[in-house]
Amino acid sequence: MRTVEYAPGRSADVYGTPGPATALLWHGTQTDSRAAVQILAQALADRGLAVIAPDWDSHAPDGGRSDLLASATFAQQQASGAGLVIIGWSLGGVAAAGLTLRASELNVVVTHTVCLSGAFWADDPISGGVVQSGAPAGAVPTPFTLLTGDADDVVPASASIEFAAELRVIGWPAEVIDLPADHGSIAGARYVPDEDRYEAADDPQTRNVVDAVAELILARTGHSGR
């Protein structure tokens, strides 16, 4: 892993060597918490999918939009123009959906989007509004894989189920898969109550969840065995 600047003063961790198989992995609401998803990022890189995991600030005046778009531009450049896999956790999943639906307007090429416990009732940091408002006319549908945790007490599976239904109405393919995970472990993290934050977790149970998530991502995005 190496740390780079994707924009002045803004950091991202790069796992593997970006190229045709590259994912952009956005953490959740917690400001500048790229380290929280390092276990998942490394698991994906170990399987051949390079990962760029940037910091972003959901509490910035623009809701993190400038960070998110700058990181997407950086990832696209690092991938030599190849299409990106976009992975987002919690609010990052909402942002991933928002970027994907408007990718043609934002000059980003997205091949597949994976949302981990996406909090789809929250405002989309990309558009600043409801992500379910739909894609621009003429947008090419991108496949979505929505992963939920059966022990998630923060974001219910119904959020992903309802969002998937709304995607299908506008002709975008969407699959929902429920896993034995909680809100943190689905992204390789644990919640620290005393500090009210998430951090990376490498305990055996979380590792098992991460392995399952990584295998699903590789299988659904067509990068298995690379």
Name each model-derived stretch.
Residues 170-226:
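C-terminal catalytic histidine-bearing segment of alpha/beta-hydrolase fold enzymes
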Residues 60-79:
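Alpha/beta-hydrolase active-site loop
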Residues 1-18:
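N-terminal cap/lid segment of alpha/beta-hydrolase-fold proteins
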Residues 45-61:
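Conserved alpha/beta-hydrolase
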Residues 73-135:
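Primarily recognizes the serine-hydrolase "nucleophile elbow" in alpha/beta-hydrolase
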Residues 118-170:
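The feature captures the conserved acid-bearing segment of alpha/beta-hydrolase catalytic domains
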Residues 20-28:
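Short beta-strand element of the alpha/beta-hydrolase
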Residues 30-41, 56, 158:
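The serine-hydrolase catalytic nucleophile loop
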